[in-house]
């Protein structure tokens, strides 16, 4: 399974590594779970609609979401 970060999501990931290690741990748990079961599991996965149809989101915390798309053998974040 290959993770592909868009520029903005990679910048966010690097930001959280500097600011909040607990949040990075949660993001890593979500990514690991997504690679096993992309459409169910932790973080309350839900499909997005309209402009983001085909994408899914999972809760990092009450305010932040991890948005991703599963295509072929890639997880686009």
Regions found by a protein language model. Give the residues of each.
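Short, surface-exposed charged micro-motifs
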Residues: 67
């Amino acid at each position: 399974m290959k993770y592909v970060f868009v520029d903005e999501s990679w910048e966010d990931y690097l930001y959280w590594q500097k600011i909040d290690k607990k949040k990075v741990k949660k993001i890593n748990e979500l990514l690991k779970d997504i690679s096993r079961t992309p459409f169910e599991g932790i973080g309350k996965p839900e499909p997005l609609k309209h402009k983001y149809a085909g994408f899914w989101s999972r809760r990092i915390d009450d305010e932040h979401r991890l948005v991703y798309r599963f295509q072929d053998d890639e997880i686009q974040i």
